[in-house]
Every structure is written in C-alpha cells, then in structure tokens.
C-alpha cells in the first residue's frame, strides 16, 4: 500500500478531500480483482479509470453484466475480489460487504480503511446492471486501468466506448436529476465522435422507454442547481458555473439532437 503522505499529497494537488483520493486508489485495486466477472465498466468512473487520468473523481463503480450470472456466484466472486484486493494492496478491505438484488441488477457496498481510525470506514458503492437490462450498441473496449500511484498495479478491463458513455449520460438527463451527467456531457461533447453519439441515441432512449422532453428538462433546472455543488465539489478542484453548463448542455440537445 502506498504511504498516507502520498495520498495526502495527491489530494492537495487535485484540490479534493483525502477521502476522495483514498476511494480512487481503492477502486483501482477492486477493478483489478473484479476482472474475472464478465461485465463492462461504464459511466463517469469509466472515463477517469481508463480514458482520462485527470478527469473528475467518481464515487461509485457502475457495470453492465455481459451474461446471466446468479446472485450467489456474484457474491462468491466479490468475496474473492475483496480478499484478493486486500492481500495484494495492503488496504484494509472489510470481508463483509452489503449485497442487494433488485429488478435492475445488484447493489454491492464494499468498505475499507486507509487513514481512518476506529470504526469509521469508507464505502465504495458498486452497481451491476443485469444482463438484458441494458442495450450495448457499440463495441466494448479492452483498456488498461490508469493507476497514478506509486505501487504496482497492472490490469485490463472491459469498458464502454466514450460515445456510448456520453449517449447514456444524455439519456439520464431525462430519467433523473444527477448533476454529474450534466458536467460530463458539457466536458466531453467536443472530445467524442458526436455523429456516433447521435446515431445511437434513439435506440438508447427507446430501450428504456425514455422521451426526449426538453420542456420537462428545463423545468428541472432548479433541481439540478440545488444539487450541483454538493454533488461535485469533492470530485474536482474547480467547479464550472452551473448556469454555463446547464445552458450549453440544453442548447446542444436542442440544436443537434432530433428524433
């Protein structure tokens, strides 16, 4: 395990809490040991972990299962991954983890300690979407995990393409209120092949029976704004102005996305 001074130095440089860097570091070891499960990483964590080293930090790990896997097998593989991560990294991962199955998939809570003392533990929330509950439209990538820390970690994982990640982020605008989705689309739009994003969006919306309702989205502006700072301030040093991000995201959808 890397020394606590390295974690604290990284936190100062990134302008985020120590707990954010600890979680980022621990997530990498879990990713390495979860690669035995046939699933693909997606969402904001996928952006930081394999595409852009200095992208915003992410709290959770989100995956889509690529085959039917029973709950008991997932529990077994997660226990193996937690124990393997603990042995290889020296991080104090708890052998006990939370596990819940729902209609969409599985929710797992993994706990660990690095600099904390006493009973306090940091949680990593992991969501697995069941096979068939999401439609992957573009070829998956096999990418190396970016590990900007002083110990030795080498791992390759399956991950969504950036275009598919952005398409799901846009769809998410119309499903729930998550400021990180606004930030990601705002930041990534000029860095992906938007032609491909626009080609797959209709199928993405149709699969989840989501409507492209701009009027409803603009009505929820205040909800996004109220959650903006608390949702993102611990994930990056400089948070852009909410009005700039929201206005630009809505304008891009209005002007460039039609179906």
Predicted regions and their residues:
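Active-site glycine-centered loops adjacent to acidic/histidine catalytic or metal-binding residues
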Residues: 44
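Structured mid-to-C-terminal alpha-helical surface segments
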Residues: 1-40, 49-61, 66-259
């Amino acid at each position: 395990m890397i020394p606590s001074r390295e974690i604290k130095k990284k936190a100062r440089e990134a302008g985020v809490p120590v707990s954010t860097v600890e979680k980022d570091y621990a997530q990498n070891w879990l990713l390495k040991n979860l690669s035995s499960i046939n699933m693909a990483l997606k969402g904001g964590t996928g952006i930081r972990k394999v595409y852009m080293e200095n992208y915003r930090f992410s709290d959770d790990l989100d995956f889509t299962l690529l085959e039917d896997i029973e709950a008991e097998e997932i529990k077994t593989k997660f226990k193996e991954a937690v124990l393997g991560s603990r042995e290889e990294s020296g991080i104090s991962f708890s052998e006990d983890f939370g596990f819940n199955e729902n209609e969409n998939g599985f929710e797992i809570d993994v706990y660990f300690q690095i600099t904390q003392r006493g009973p306090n533990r940091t949680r990593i929330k992991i969501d697995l979407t069941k096979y068939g509950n999401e439609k992957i439209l573009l070829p998956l990538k096999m990418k190396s995990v970016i590990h900007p820390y002083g110990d030795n970690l080498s791992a390759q994982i399956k991950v969504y393409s950036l275009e598919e990640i952005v398409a799901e982020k846009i769809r998410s605008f119309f499903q729930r209120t998550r400021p990180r989705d606004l930030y990601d689309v705002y930041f990534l739009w000029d860095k992906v092949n938007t032609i491909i994003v626009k080609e797959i969006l209709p199928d993405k919306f149709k699969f989840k029976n989501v409507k492209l309702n701009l009027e409803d989205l603009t009505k929820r502006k205040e909800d996004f704004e109220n959650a903006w700072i608390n949702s993102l301030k611990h994930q990056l040093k400089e948070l852009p102005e909410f009005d700039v991000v929201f206005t630009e995201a809505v304008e891009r959808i209005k002007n460039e996305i039609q179906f």
